[in-house]
Amino acid sequence: MRKSLVCLMMSFVLTLNVFAKEQKPSPIEPSESFYPNLEFQNCDNDCLFTLLETGLYFNFLSRFNNDNANELLVNIYTKLLNSIIDFEKRIQKNASIKLAIIIPEQTIKSYSNTIINSSIAYLLRQRAQIKVKVFLIGTEDESKITKAFKQAQDEKFNYIVAGFTDKGVKNLLKESLDSNVKVFIPTVHKRNFDTQNENVYFGSIDYQKQIQKLLEYSNGKNIIFSDGTALANRLDENVLNAGNGSEKIYTINSSKFDFRSILNQNRSFQDSSIILNTSLIKTALISSQIRTYDIEPFVLLSTQINYNPILLSLTQINDRKKLLLANSISNEDQTLSYLNELFSQNINYNWIAYATSVGLDYFYTQFLDKDSQRIFDEGLNDNQFDYKVKIIRSQGLGFTPLQDQ
């Protein structure tokens, strides 16, 4: 088994080098059936080995889960990943420009693949001839972050993408980084931190800005459904801070939530603005229950968390006819979409992939290759990328922007 996998990996590296040097990606988007999105399907160790044995390397990378994988699979994942981003060894051997990607994969889970894959897709899109290395550090413990950044700096990686949560950023900000090291963090917003470090850039979309935009479409009778997660709690707080003080909050933190006791003959829900700070599944459940109990809300409002085509398959058209969503993704590059599809992720709906691409686009064109052209036009405001917010509505079997924006 081990010998066959090594042979497969060697043949893959040779194939990839040919691809990087000779082939041009088609600007035509692939069909959904050819590059299916398998994000919600579990792939155990046997499944991962099967993907390797059949040569489905991109699928292996996109579905790898470090929590369940054995040591051999972890080693193969790391080697295969660094084989993919080692685009041209002859050029990279003498390259003075380097990019490091630091990932606490046990902490950010599936976001690990999203950040790495979208980075690879962007560099392929730009035909980048730079040295890239991925550092998998497990968790965001201060000692591990210190070790990773020391190693990256010792190896002369001056440009770093770090997939950190709030905890990781707080530990990072304690570090004494070289003055020429620049760090981009796509996963969090600068608003959450008291820092003036000019070499640390933040890339999260602005949920607070989205809430403020959504409330422009409210009639003031605000009712919040929340699922009790850290993100939902932050969204709830944003609504309360921007609202009129009359908001009510209902938290759905279990599958046994009693909708009947809340919705049945509850006149306060009629003609109300219902704000859904809930996951896709719970949003679909709430919207169907609202219709079941003959409630006619003024509007349903939700942020980026529910801007996903999966919502269309989870809900009936009548369930979402009054639903408005905030969206900060604005990708028009079809080749970049295609390359992300190779990794079974959709940059047009995955904000982590989009934010990673936006930040890397800025780093690459401003610092790594100043002769290249930017793909995105998001600007910087005090080292935080600034995203526009568009309001989207469901129309039939798809999404469409409101016309009066």
Pin down the residues of each PLM region.
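Repetitive helical segments and hydrophobic/amphipathic motifs
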Residues: 11-12
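Extracytosolic ligand-binding ectodomains
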Residues: 2-8, 17-405
